[in-house]
Structure formats: structure tokens, C-alpha cells
Amino acid sequence: MRKTIKVTLIRSRIGRLPKHKATLDGLGLRRINRHVELNNTPAIRGMLNLVSYMIKVELLEEGNQCV
């Protein structure tokens, strides 16, 4: 069963390092309290690890898609 990850931006991008802002852009997170669903891959996990202090991560099963 393939898992997806629900990622929510909980802290502002203002005053962050340009590398962290670029990582958030790559993840598709542009506004606070917005979320995206991403595939659970090592590349995505590395990006999430870089900006872990700004986001909330939840694992979703294949049938549990968020609305």
C-alpha cells in the first residue's frame, strides 16, 4: 500500500533562509495553514527534514485522502 504525506505550513516564511524558502516552493507550500499531499519518497523526506521547524507532517493511507 502506497502512503502519502499531508504537509501543512504552520510558520511564516518571512525572515527565513533563501534555501528554506526555495524548499517550501518545491514542496508547493506558499501560505500559512495550507496543506499539500506528497508521495512518501526519500527526496521528499529530505526536503521535509530541512524545514521541519516550519511544518506539520501527517502520514495518510491510500484510501484516506484529505479534502
From Swiss-Prot:
SUPFAM superfamilies: Ribosomal protein L30p/L7e. Keywords: Ribonucleoprotein, Ribosomal protein. GO terms for cellular component: cytosolic large ribosomal subunit. It comes from the Bacteria. One of its GO terms (biological process) is translation. The keyword Ribonucleoprotein applies. The keyword Nucleotidyltransferase does not apply. InterPro entries: Ribo_uL30_ferredoxin-like_sf, Ribosomal_uL30_bac-type, Ribosomal_uL30_ferredoxin-like. One of its GO terms (molecular function) is structural constituent of ribosome. Part of the 50S ribosomal subunit. PANTHER family: LARGE RIBOSOMAL SUBUNIT PROTEIN UL30M, MITOCHONDRIAL RIBOSOMAL PROTEIN L30. Belongs to the universal ribosomal protein uL30 family. This is Large ribosomal subunit protein uL30. It comes from Hamiltonella defensa subsp. Acyrthosiphon pisum (strain 5AT). The lineage of its organism: Bacteria, Pseudomonadati, Pseudomonadota, Gammaproteobacteria, Enterobacterales.
